[in-house]
Regions:
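Hydrophobic alpha-helical transmembrane segments of integral membrane proteins
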Residues: 12-13
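Beta-sheet ligand-binding and adhesion/scaffold domains
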Residues: 42-50, 97-159
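Hydrophobic membrane-targeting and insertion signals
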Residues: 21-23
Length: 159
């Protein structure tokens, strides 16, 4: 079998095109890693109603669950947070926003703010500032509920 120069040139011209396979997919970015904060945390929230009032209420403790969901494209530093409180003074569920500083690894400071429908018939406000470790969160809370101010603390452990 004799191969001509012409056939060899045609083969050399089309060989790179055959290897391409008709195009390809665009490069993909690496899948983002999950935040240590994402997921469900459970613990205790203690509330001091009207702490600066003439007759402050007694502190009330109850179980609480916080669930953090990462907001996409925020460098794992912003979260949609659901707080479910079974505290006798503040039995609420609220959806709030949480921001993490200075970075997205523990230990980090987290700030959470939100509003909720109070069982007392008003719109309440809730805020928290805490230190988040890999498996625990310890922080303070503050807010106003119809129009009673409150302060307190929260301690959470990751499930």
């Amino acid at each position: 079998m004799r191969v001509s120069i012409r056939q060899l040139l045609v083969l050399l011209l089309f060989l790179p095109l055959i290897a391409c396979g008709g195009g390809g997919s665009a490069p993909t970015s690496p899948s983002p890693s999950q935040s240590f904060l994402a997921g469900t945390w459970r613990g205790t929230m203690t509330i001091q109603p009207d702490p600066t009032g003439a007759q402050p209420g007694a502190p009330v403790s109850g179980t609480v669950t916080w669930t953090f969901e990462v907001v996409p494209q925020t460098n794992l530093q912003s979260f949609r947070t659901t707080v479910r409180s079974e505290n006798g003074w503040l039995p609420i569920t609220l959806t709030s926003s949480t921001s993490m500083i200075p970075g997205n690894t523990p230990p980090a400071q987290i700030s959470t703010q939100g509003e909720y429908n109070s069982p007392r018939g008003c719109r309440g406000t809730f805020g928290s500032f805490a230190t988040a470790e890999a498996r625990s969160i310890q922080g303070s809370i503050t807010g106003v509920d119809c129009p009673v101010p409150f302060t307190g603390s929260v301690t959470l452990t990751k499930e």
